[in-house]
Amino acid sequence: MTIAKSVLLFILAAVAEIGGAWLVWQAVREGRAWWWAGLGIIALGLYGFVATLQPDAHFGRILAAYGGVFVAGSLVWGMVFDGFRPDRWDVIGSVICLVGVAVIMFAPRGTTS
């Protein structure tokens, strides 16, 4: 259950952070209304809160692992919302990042982690 909870929280954090950044991008770079940026700022704040819900107690570990989720999630977001098509190097790089996430978060550790 802890792995499932971590994965769900990482996905939720990615939606909040990537979605928030995308909303700000839409306002600033694509000329959308200012309130798009406001919603983006709220979503980015929500991301910061969601990260605190991870079962692991170590800030550095959580944020380092989330970085890999962010890389892969950003490519998926771009595909869904902007028509971006990643090349094989984008895909290979994101898979490497996700393997890193699994090692950082779920490798067996002693009690002194």
Swiss-Prot record:
Assigned GO CC terms: plasma membrane
Pfam families cross-referenced by the UniProt entry: UPF0060 (PF02694)
TM region positions: 7-27, 33-53, 62-82, 91-111
Family indicated by similarity: Belongs to the UPF0060 family.
Record flagged with keyword Membrane: yes
Coiled coil: none
Domain of life: Bacteria
Lineage: Bacteria, Bacillati, Actinomycetota, Actinomycetes, Micrococcales
Keywords, sorted A to Z: Cell membrane, Membrane, Plasmid, Transmembrane, Transmembrane helix
SUPFAM superfamilies reported for this sequence: Multidrug resistance efflux transporter EmrE (SSF103481)
Protein name: UPF0060 membrane protein Arth_4423
Subcellular location: Cell membrane
Topological type in the membrane: Multi-pass membrane protein
Organism name: Arthrobacter sp. (strain FB24)
Principal subcellular localization: membrane
